[in-house]
């Protein structure tokens, strides 16, 4: 294997040289997806002006149809993918442009997806970011108030303690797993719970899907915001983010597992 890596027999194509994938011809998967996600919405979004950043990725094909199917006045940006410009200076990993749009005062909320659209981050009308912990907290509380929450919420060891405090104040249990959506989903299934996710905006709403779906997350949050009747900034402030820092600690492979099991490390 090492010899193959050092001296590959042929040149491997990368980036834009790989080529393109043609659209599926057997039916209309875009329309089917839009119908599915729109069908999960508990309300219409009529009158809600939304800025949407598609990261020049997967949601470019669906976001406009989805938000307008729900009645939202959606302004779609970064939805011209060419196979190379995905996530370039846009999307949930580069929120600066969306934040500037929100500060203009013309939008109620901004939604940013990543390239494959499994994550969603939100920006309120003041330009402040609403990360995955805040989104999950508001949704879990809204679900409980409407009799939709099954048990509690699942986060990870990187979930901000502010979310723990927010949920505990509302008698909503929260469990933490290792980082990764597979561990979040495993815990959700084991407990029979229906919401979990990560600070990055990767949320699993298992009543509708078994993996993260940024557009589904956005639709559920926007409906919650509309039904609650409060602006995004007020909802954002409900979940206080505690000071937090993440540090990568180097360790030999032989001892990584043992180190990860130490109570002192787990608690940090």
Kindly give the residue locations of the regions a language model identified.
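Predominant activation on well-ordered alpha-helical scaffold segments within soluble catalytic domains
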Residues: 2, 35-38, 61-68, 96-99, ...
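Active-site flanking residues adjacent to catalytic metal/cofactor-binding acidic residues
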Residues: 52-55, 113-115, 197, 206
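Gly/Ser/Thr-enriched, mixed-charge loops and adjacent short helices
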Residues: 1-104
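Conserved active-site and cofactor/substrate-binding residues in soluble primary-metabolism enzymes
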Residues: 28-32, 58-62, 90-93, 115-117, ...
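Short acidic, glycine/serine/threonine-rich loops at helix termini
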Residues: 61-65, 87-90, 120-126, 134, ...
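Phosphate-binding and adjacent anionic-ligand microenvironments
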Residues: 3, 109, 145-268
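Short hydrophobic/aromatic-enriched beta-strand-loop microsegments
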Residues: 71-78, 129-134, 171-179
């Amino acid at each position: 294997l090492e010899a193959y890596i050092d001296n590959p027999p042929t040149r491997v194509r990368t980036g834009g040289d790989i080529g393109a994938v043609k659209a599926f011809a057997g039916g209309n998967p875009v329309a089917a997806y839009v119908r599915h996600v729109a069908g999960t919405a508990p309300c219409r979004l009529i009158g809600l002006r939304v800025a949407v950043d598609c990261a020049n990725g997967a949601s470019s094909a669906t976001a406009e149809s989805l938000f307008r199917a729900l009645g939202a006045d959606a302004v779609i940006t970064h939805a011209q993918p060419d196979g190379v410009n995905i996530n370039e200076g846009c999307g949930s990993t580069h929120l600066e442009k969306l934040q500037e749009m929100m500060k203009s005062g013309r939008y109620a909320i901004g939604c940013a997806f990543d390239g494959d659209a499994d994550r969603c981050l939100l920006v309120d009308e003041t330009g402040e970011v609403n990360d995955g912990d805040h989104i999950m907290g508001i949704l879990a509380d809204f679900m409980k108030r409407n009799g939709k929450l099954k048990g509690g919420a699942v986060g990870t060891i990187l979930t901000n303690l502010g979310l723990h405090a927010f949920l505990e104040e509302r008698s909503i249990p929260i469990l933490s797993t290792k980082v990764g959506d597979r561990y979040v989903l495993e815990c959700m299934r084991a407990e029979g719970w229906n919401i979990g996710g990560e600070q990055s905006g990767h949320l699993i709403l298992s009543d509708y899907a078994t993996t993260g779906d940024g557009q589904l997350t956005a639709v559920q949050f926007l409906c919650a915001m509309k039904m609650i009747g409060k602006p995004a900034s007020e909802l954002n402030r409900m979940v206080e983010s505690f000071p937090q820092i993440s540090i990568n600690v180097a360790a030999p492979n032989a001892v990584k597992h043992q180190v990860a099991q130490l109570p002192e490390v787990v608690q940090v």
